[in-house]
Curated annotation (Swiss-Prot):
GO terms for biological process: proteolysis. Its EC number is 3.4.21.-. One of its GO terms (cellular component) is plasma membrane. This is Probable protease SohB. The lineage of its organism: Bacteria, Pseudomonadati, Pseudomonadota, Gammaproteobacteria, Enterobacterales. It holds the Pfam family Peptidase_S49_N. The chain crosses the membrane at residues 9-29, 185-205. It is found in: Cell membrane. Keywords: Cell membrane, Hydrolase, Membrane, Protease, Serine protease, Transmembrane, Transmembrane helix. It comes from the Bacteria. Belongs to the peptidase S49 family. It is a multi-pass membrane protein. The keyword Protein biosynthesis does not apply. The active site is at residues 179, 231.
């Protein structure tokens, strides 16, 4: 009897372990499949339909019950008639593509320190380049306080692809485009910004804590071995030298020069030495300094189109 009970308990343990492993495996497969699908999917929303819906809701909210009935009836009749006209037109013009109505593609970029949204931005831009017709435009609603230069450098390069294909790019800044964020914004053919948005901060910053004295105080040795004179300049735990600090600052200044040259190449009318001090300004002052082209929100820009 004990043998049967022990065997049943052993079998139950094996079954539980197998079920647990299978569950974990299925979760991993499901997540991987979801990521794979997500990588190649773009959500496309018609802003025309959205604003039309909002407008109709506001109109209806101001009407009496009788007025709503009349409006709904006439609106249904209009849609039905328009649908018939469109179907007749398409039947007669099977291969016709409407080239006369330019499209405004609206993209969003909400940047973090690593500019991780560049992954989706590159796919969106590739899709637009493949589909865009003559006179189509792109609006990028940008919000970023900057971050690592290689991340924002790549994001700026992605936006440059639109300019190279002669697709007009407008960047709108409703809140902030500073440092790496402005590196992206300056690529645009036209920059608009809200009055109190934060613009500029064309500079480079780096700060590193050093715990070497604390380690020495507690009798902790720290060894750092490198191959190459400047493989490591400033460190967190090692002892930093004067030469290392000078090299670090030299690299920092060189990066700033590259940043300035890039911004100036995109906006030649800027007094680059005046605006590249690392300062930031509100939208109204940024307009005076030619960092932007117009005071306007993204909402006004979209509705005007």
């Amino acid at each position: 009897m004990d043998f049967i009970l022990n065997y049943a308990l052993f079998f139950f343990k094996i079954f539980t372990l197998f079920a647990l492993i299978l569950t974990i495996f299925l979760i991993i497969v499901n997540v991987a499949r979801h990521k794979s699908k997500k990588k190649y999917e773009l959500d496309i929303v018609s802003l025309n339909s959205y604003y039309e819906h909002v407008k109709n809701k506001i109109i209806l909210s101001t009407m009496s019950t009788y007025e709503k009935k009349i409006w709904n009836k006439s609106n249904k009749l209009f849609k039905k008639t328009r649908s018939k006209i469109n179907m007749t037109f398409l039947k007669k013009n099977k291969y016709y593509l409407n080239q006369n109505n330019p499209i405004l593609y609206v993209l969003d970029f909400k940047g973090n320190v690593s500019a991780s949204e560049v992954t989706s931005l590159r796919e969106e831009i590739s899709a637009i380049i493949l589909a865009a017709k003559e006179n189509d435009e792109v609006l990028l609603r940008l919000e970023s306080g900057g971050g690592v230069i290689h991340g924002y450098g790549l994001a700026s390069s992605q936006l440059s692809r639109l300019r190279e294909k002669n697709i007009r790019l407008t960047v709108s800044v409703d809140k902030i485009a500073a440092s790496g964020g402005y590196m992206m914004a300056c690529v645009a053919n036209y920059i608009i910004a809200a009055p109190f948005s934060v613009i500029g901060s064309i500079g480079v910053v780096a700060q590193i804590p050093n715990f070497n004295k604390l380690l020495k105080k507690n009798n902790v040795d720290m060894e750092l071995h490198t191959s190459g004179l400047y493989k490591r300049t400033l460190t967190v735990f090692g002892e930093n030298t004067k030469e290392a600090r000078e090299k670090f600052c030299k690299d920092l200044n060189f990066t700033h020069v590259l940043f300035k040259e890039f911004v100036h190449s995109m906006r030649p009318s800027l007094n680059i030495d005046e605006v590249s001090t690392g300062e930031h300004w509100f939208g109204t002052t940024a307009l005076e300094k030619k960092l932007i082209d117009k005071i306007e929100t993204s909402d006004d820009f979209i509705i005007s189109r």
